[in-house]
């Protein structure tokens, strides 16, 4: 497989897993445990159990983040508003695949379950790893900027590297 070439589901099993596929300890324990269980069910071929665990992980995340709304979709929309830097496509996938199973479709097939768990892992990585890391980087930059400006009597206006701190 060449760089820039799309990953096929069969290839995804042989490549070294990206960092975001390992659920970080900063992710709320209830969500993390459900995702581990969903992965275990998927590997064992228990698609109904995996589907229930993955969908419960989404619900647990919504509860943990106090995402309110009249429907599952509205709650995910509220979460997307809380974290605007998280790609909207991840929320769309959770809306499409993460709602509770119905009698007609009790379980996702293996590929769709994998897509849901990976989308959720990426979302969690964005929220609980990249977001806090971004805040730390910007705070550090702000401190550097403030030390530069306090040492020099610049005539230029003060620049704020991190306006929402």
Feature roles, as predicted:
Residues 43, 62, 66, 125-128, ...:
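Hydrophobic/aromatic-lined pockets within catalytic cores
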Residues 1-47, 155-165:
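Charged alpha-helical initiation segments
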Residues 42, 61, 102-105:
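Structural motif corresponding to the C-terminal cap of alpha-helices
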Residues 1-3, 72-164:
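Long, charged low-complexity segments
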Residues 47, 66-67, 106, 110:
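Alpha-helix boundary/capping and short turn/kink residues
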Residues 31, 50, 54, 58, ...:
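Short runs of predominantly hydrophobic/aromatic residues within well-ordered alpha helices
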Residues 49-73, 79:
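Hydrophobic alpha-helical packing segments in soluble, helical-rich domains
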């Amino acid at each position: 497989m060449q760089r820039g070439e799309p990953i096929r589901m069969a290839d995804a099993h042989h490549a070294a897993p990206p960092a975001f596929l390992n659920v970080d300890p900063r992710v709320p324990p209830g969500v993390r445990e459900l995702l581990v269980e969903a992965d275990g069910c998927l590997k064992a071929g228990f698609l109904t159990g995996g589907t229930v665990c993955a969908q419960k992980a989404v619900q647990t995340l919504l509860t943990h983040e106090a995402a309110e709304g009249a429907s599952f979709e509205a709650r995910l929309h509220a979460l997307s508003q809380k974290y605007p830097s998280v790609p909207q496509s991840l929320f769309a996938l959770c809306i499409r695949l993460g709602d509770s199973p119905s009698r007609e479709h009790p379980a996702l097939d293996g590929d769709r379950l994998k897509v849901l768990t990976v989308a959720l892992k990426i979302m969690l990585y964005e929220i609980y790893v990249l977001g806090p890391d971004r805040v730390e980087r910007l705070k550090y930059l702000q401190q550097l900027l403030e030390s530069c400006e306090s040492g020099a009597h610049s005539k230029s206006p003060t620049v704020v590297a991190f306006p929402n701190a």
